Amino acid sequence: MELIFSAALCSVLVSILLKFAKNKGFDALQMIAWNYAIASILSYLWFKPDLAHISVSATPWWLIIVLGMVLPSIFLCLAKSLQTAGILKTEIAQRLSVVLSLLAAYFLFQEQFSQLKMAGVTLGITAVLCLIFSQAGSSNTNLNRKGMLFLLSVWVGYAIVDILLKYTTSLGLQFPVILTLMFIFAFILSIVYLFIQKTQWKIKNVIAGLLLGLLNFANIALYVKAHILLKDSPAIVFAGMNILVVLFGVLAGLFIFKEKLKKMTTLGLVLGLAGVVCLALAI
């Protein structure tokens, strides 16, 4: 359980760092780029992927490149959502991206749906709608629309990443290989984009990005390790991770960033947690 707790804490610390960094004048895109630099190195050292025997012709490079483009884009949307919608709503939306992944598994991979899984998906979608509509109550119309857009982007974006990862692994590539390659491509593409934009490089963004990458990778590594150690209890890992991230996100939003828990947000939170429990029971 300590691994799940630590993984969830690292996940929320990523969001807290991004939110604080923006307020202190850091460049989110530079941070995201350097985050993938350290994540690539750590992924190679931790998971030890067999990159030497990759088949150049058989590897779906287009998928790796797409993932390399999507990852930093979604990370940037996450940073924007944290600023406009807040950490509380953003963490819930990110965690509930799993319901879209499950719907994709049903339609694309012919995965069977039980009544519990269907209930979890329905509750999850309803929860996200509550979060989006609760954003409509903001007095700032422009901030309001941006918050709704970025919340939706986070929800859909993380689901797309999950779907692409599942599809890539279904083609026979090992997860450590995919993870390392997509981190490398995400770093390269992010750096190229920043050079094209003639970005003013600052050492503080590099340092913050490396810290971001350390937390981001720790979240992934600890979560994978928890699944390995608790391989006979995947529901505990799934439910524990998602519920703890949501709860930590709520606590951070309320006590660190002084966000308000509106009625619709509270309803979304309750429905989201209920959805996670249903999905965990369905595993």
Residue ranges and their predicted role:
Residues 1-283:
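Polytopic alpha-helical membrane proteins, predominantly small-molecule transporters/carriers
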